[in-house]
Amino acid sequence: MMQHASPAPALTMMATQNVPPPPYQDSPQMTATTQPPSKAQAVHISAPSAAASTPVPSAPIDPQAQLEADKRAVYRHPLFPLLTLLFEKCEQATQGSECITSASFDVDIENFVHQQEQEHKPFFSDDPELDNLMVKAIQVLRIHLLELEKVNELCKDFCNRYITCLKTKMHSDNLLRNDLGGPYSPNQPSINLHSQDLLQNSPNSMSGVSNNPQGIVVPASALQQGNIAMTTVNSQVVSGGALYQPVTMVTSQGQVVTQAIPQGAIQIQNTQVNLDLTSLLDNEDKKSKNKRGVLPKHATNIMRSWLFQHLMHPYPTEDEKRQIAAQTNLTLLQVNNWFVNARRRILQPMLDASNPDPAPKAKKIKSQHRPTQRFWPNSIAAGVLQQQGGAPGTNPDGSINLDNLQSLSSDNATMAMQQAMMAAHDDSLDGTEEEDEDEMEEEEEEELEEEVDELQTTNVSDLGLEHSDSLV
């Protein structure tokens, strides 16, 4: 192989270079020896390049390792501290009642930017995809924080409106106020009794108090102020005229404590007891008088005076009703009902007395003879009346003569005045039930009048009584 390969290179070398033969024979041998390694080196270099072009099918990457690598990339990102701060603010706004405002996060962003600029740190990394992910995450948490702030504002507004509505509707001031000076009110009357004076001066009142099974209970704060409250359960009068009875107290924690007061421990002025008991009994009497449906006399006097001052237009406006309700300590419904009843009971009889109209009376009297017209015609009724001689003061058809009604005009005025006087005595009633009864009576009268009108317009032939002569 060496002998066949050497002549060709030798020829080429000789053709190109004019060199002596001995050096030339050495040179082909050197080229022949050096050429195979060059080919082998070329083959060795090409093999790694082919392997590097296809690394995926040979060795697949573990998903867990890729996830850990992505986590480390997120943790090392320059915007990760800002993302952590925003996430903590969202958690605080969700857990507590005090919501973190969005303005505070704006301040945190400004501080973060200044800190990064002072430390000469970048805001983004070399991976654009990771930078986009961090910016989108910060935007989402920012929107979430704004929504939490809106929800917190709505909750606070709802609570404020609800509390205001409760205070307005329930009248908490009126509910908490106690006119009798209850056991927990600050103006509680102190029942401080001197036992001997009480037994000597007011034995009847003492016997009534000692038999009361309920007693009086006060908190401990009232006892510290010198006011002693006692329950008169199983009270006894021992020797020496002293009073011995157990006392029930309520502590500041709400516990009920029963103690026995020894002889002579209750020493208070008798005059104060008399005043307190008198005021208590007076208030009870006033409450018992304020029954349902009965208005106070001073309230009716105020409303009656307003009614007579406005006879031309006895309809108070809403503002006037509120003013009258404030003066009389009544509700708007009570004031409205009283004026409705007063216009019907007081003003209407006065108008009827001043303008007598006998037509309604004649119509009502005429309706009393309804059975005569219902069961036979007018011709039959006239024949019967002629046989009986007729009733005095009546027409041949059985109706009452209108001339006799003229004498009722004075009676009408008298009855109207009597009704007005009776209404003045009864105007203190609420009158809601009487309104319903009067309306029902008026409806019944209207129905009866309609039936009478229909019967008057009915033909005799419709009743099947055409041959009236045969029936006489």
From Swiss-Prot:
UniProt entry tagged with the keyword Lipid biosynthesis: no
Molecular function (Gene Ontology), one example: DNA binding
Gene3D superfamilies: Homeodomain-like
Compositional bias ranges of the Low complexity kind: 46-56
Polar residues bias locations: 26-38, 396-405
GO cellular component: nucleus
DNA-binding region coordinates: 291-350
Biased composition annotated in UniProt, kind: Acidic residues: 429-454
Protein name: Homeobox protein PKNOX2
Phylogenetic lineage: Eukaryota, Metazoa, Chordata, Craniata, Vertebrata
Record gene name: PKNOX2
